[in-house]
């Protein structure tokens, strides 16, 4: 949601412009590609070609009982590096879906009378967008995000298999 909200607001506020077309077309592509294909592409390009993170496999470092309470101990950075690709590959299709949903709701809300009234009162565009437009538009976004938690767990099963992460599958 951290990436979907700004992208959706910008795309809706700049509707019909080049920015909107770039965001919408990019999101259409990312929402059409399954998460396991994104996982394989990310593992190949970021893991193998660039070598930034380990492409496959999950071997967490050994942790003693004394180290568990510390975020810096027990290889927290190593865990983070190992989880970047699975998290990104699971979140890209959801970001695309949430952004498109928010964009549609914001465009509909921007055409409401109370938004015109807020603009005629002299409120700034930023205040109108965040207080008068985002709040009513975010209801469906957060409802959809809550309902997609089950699909996220189902998608995690495939991603765990691809990256050899011990978990559900």
Where in the sequence are the language-model features?
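Alpha-helical transmembrane segments of integral membrane proteins
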Residues: 1-19, 35, 48, 64-169
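Transmembrane alpha-helical core residues of multi-pass small-molecule transporters
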Residues: 27, 43-47, 135
């Amino acid at each position: 949601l951290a990436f979907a909200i700004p992208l959706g607001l910008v795309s809706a506020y700049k509707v019909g412009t080049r920015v909107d077309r770039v965001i919408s077309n990019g999101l259409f592509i990312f929402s059409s590609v399954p998460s396991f294909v994104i996982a394989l592409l990310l593992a190949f390009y970021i893991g193998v070609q660039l070598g930034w993170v380990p492409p496959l496999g999950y071997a967490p470092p050994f942790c003693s009982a004394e180290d568990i309470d510390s975020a810096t101990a027990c290889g927290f950075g190593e865990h983070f590096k190992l989880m970047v690709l699975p998290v990104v590959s699971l979140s890209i299709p959801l970001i695309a879906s949430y952004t498109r949903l928010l964009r549609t709701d914001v465009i509909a809300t921007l055409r409401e009378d109370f938004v015109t009234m807020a603009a005629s009162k002299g409120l700034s565009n930023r205040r109108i967008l965040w207080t008068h437009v985002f709040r009513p538009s975010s209801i469906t976004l957060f409802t959809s995000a809550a309902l997609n938690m089950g699909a996220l767990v189902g998608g995690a099963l495939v991603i765990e298999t691809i990256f050899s992460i011990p978990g559900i599958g």
